[in-house]
UniProtKB/Swiss-Prot annotation:
<comment type="similarity">
    <text>Belongs to the amino acid/polyamine transporter 2 family.</text>
</comment>
<feature type="transmembrane region" description="Helical">
    <location>
        <begin position="418"/>
        <end position="438"/>
    </location>
</feature>
<keyword id="KW-0915">Sodium</keyword>
<protein>
    <recommendedName>
        <fullName>Putative sodium-coupled neutral amino acid transporter 8</fullName>
    </recommendedName>
</protein>
<comment type="function">
    <text>Putative sodium-dependent amino acid/proton antiporter.</text>
</comment>
<feature type="transmembrane region" description="Helical">
    <location>
        <begin position="100"/>
        <end position="120"/>
    </location>
</feature>
<feature type="transmembrane region" description="Helical">
    <location>
        <begin position="350"/>
        <end position="370"/>
    </location>
</feature>
<feature type="transmembrane region" description="Helical">
    <location>
        <begin position="223"/>
        <end position="243"/>
    </location>
</feature>
<feature type="transmembrane region" description="Helical">
    <location>
        <begin position="183"/>
        <end position="203"/>
    </location>
</feature>
<keyword id="KW-0739">Sodium transport</keyword>
<dbReference type="GO" id="GO:0006865">
    <property type="term" value="P:amino acid transport"/>
</dbReference>
<keyword id="KW-0812">Transmembrane</keyword>
<feature type="transmembrane region" description="Helical">
    <location>
        <begin position="373"/>
        <end position="393"/>
    </location>
</feature>
<dbReference type="Pfam" id="PF01490">
    <property type="entry name" value="Aa_trans"/>
</dbReference>
<keyword id="KW-0472">Membrane</keyword>
<keyword id="KW-0813">Transport</keyword>
<feature type="transmembrane region" description="Helical">
    <location>
        <begin position="300"/>
        <end position="320"/>
    </location>
</feature>
Length: 440
């Protein structure tokens, strides 16, 4: 995300966004790319690996997707160098025109909104396990059959959390005080990977271990079902333009190396998590891997707390990004008919914030599990990973002098990216909607 990227660059003392000299190193760029990509998406990988039909098929799909992921990053760096913009939307609008730029802005808001839904769904899952753990340890509960108290209901807990903690953190116009906690998502992801690997070897009584995965069982439909999870997990393309603009060495080959290294590290982390998580639980693996582990396991409780705290601190930043786009569009529209005061701006900010939190909370409360949310996010992510980079490449080569053969090859690759992105969006979104309807 662009705001996370800016804050990371600021923390490294490498800011090049305010007119200064860009001085972000390649290692710093890799670190920020990892920070932008690693997060709550990791929880869904073991489930996706099992659903796709086994580790071999899942890794093959990952490797094919990696070609497009890296290609999109390189294209966006190239497009940024041509447009001289430091934001994703600015690059798309400059190269592809205002109409595509508006579409990019709409997709950007929807993507941020659904990420917030996924975050709240993850928090609710963790609160459910924590409440169950506290409730099961109650000696009175062991002696009676009294139902769980209403205040131990995770839906009540997540509602209180949103109103008491997340809402006050999200209302301020500036939330720079939270930038030091944004690394918690990366820390939680790395901790989860190590924990899953260790648990695979030390667990004495795993739940329904199934090590048999038949490659023949993986149909084309099941193969494509893992793509939304990959798109959500590896998604850092919105931030990459800001990162590239802040780099000292903007050579395209250097940016390509940064993209390859960061994506390969993500590949290792996600693959190890998916492999060991699916091997541990087999078909019993939950859409949120932490839900498959016992509620009273200390190591798992630490992972739940890390993810919960990281989401609580990152949610307001994601909300800020979406709110800024909506608020800017609304205020620009109102300025044409009346003078906008500070009081009016404050009221608009509060209303957008409250509505954003309430709607995302309501959706998170009624969505069956995180897999459906990730399918929708993965479909929307296809615009940022496949479609917009492909369009930028097609538009860029038309304005750049180059030989006919190179122009034809690049145009063809851009068209392939757009077509693949449209397919991923349509397929994943349709399946997600159908699965949600079927569960209700």
């Amino acid at each position: 995300m662009e705001e996370l990227a800016r804050e990371s660059i600021s923390l490294l003392g490498k800011s090049g966004l305010e007119g200064g000299t860009p001085s972000l190193s390649s290692m710093g760029a890799i670190f920020i790319m990892l920070k932008s990509a690693l997060g709550a998406g990791l929880l869904n990988f073991p489930w996706a690996f099992n659903k796709v039909g086994g580790m071999h098929t899942a890794i093959m799909v990952e490797l094919v997707s990696l070609i497009f992921l890296i290609s999109g990053l390189v294209i966006l760096g190239y497009a940024s160098s041509l447009s001289k913009h430091s934001t994703y939307q600015g690059v798309v609008k400059d190269l592809c025109g205002p109409a595509i730029g508006k579409l990019c802005g709409i997709c950007y808001i929807i993507n941020l909104f659904m990420i917030c839904v996924a975050f709240l769904r993850v928090v609710e899952d963790q609160l459910e396990k924590l409440c169950d753990s506290i409730h099961s340890n109650n000696t009175l509960y062991a002696m009676s059959e009294v139902s769980q108290s209403w205040y131990m209901d995770p839906r009540f807990a997540i509602t209180v959390l949103c109103l008491v903690i997340i809402l006050p953190l999200s209302i301020p116009k500036e939330i720079s005080f939270q930038k030091y906690t944004s690394i918690l998502g990366t820390l939680a992801a790395c901790y989860l990977t190590v924990m899953i690997i260790i648990k695979y070897y030390v667990m004495e009584h795993p739940v329904l271990i199934k090590h048999e995965f038949s490659s023949n069982a993986a149909s084309w439909a099941s193969m494509f079902s893992v793509v939304p999870t990959i798109c959500f997990g590896f998604q850092c393309h919105e931030a990459c333009v800001t990162i590239y603009s802040s780099m000292k060495n903007k050579c395209l080959s250097n940016w390509a190396a940064v993209s390859v290294v960061s994506m390969l590290i993500c590949l290792l982390i996600y693959s190890f998590t998916g492999i060991y998580g699916s091997l541990t639980f087999g078909e019993a693996v939950a859409a949120d891997i932490l839900m498959s582990y016992p509620g009273n396991d200390v190591a798992v409780i630490i992972a739940r707390l890390l993810f919960t705290i990281s989401i609580i601190t990152i949610y307001p930043i994601i909300l800020l990004l979406g709110r800024c786009v909506i608020q800017e569009a609304w205020l620009n529209h109102r300025e044409k008919s009346l003078f906008v005061t500070l009081t009016y701006e404050r009221c608009v900010r509060v209303v957008i914030t409250v509505l954003w939190i309430l709607v995302t909370l309501l959706i998170a409360l009624f969505v069956p599990d995180i897999s459906e949310v990730i399918s929708v996010i993965g479909g929307i992510s296809a615009f940022f990973i496949f479609i917009f980079p492909g369009l930028c490449l097609v538009c860029a080569v038309e304005s750049e002098p180059m030989n006919t053969k190179a122009k034809s090859c690049l145009t063809a690759w851009g068209a392939i990216s757009v077509v693949c992105g449209a397919f991923v969006f349509g397929q994943s979104t349709t399946i997600a909607v159908m699965e949600i309807i079927a569960k209700f």
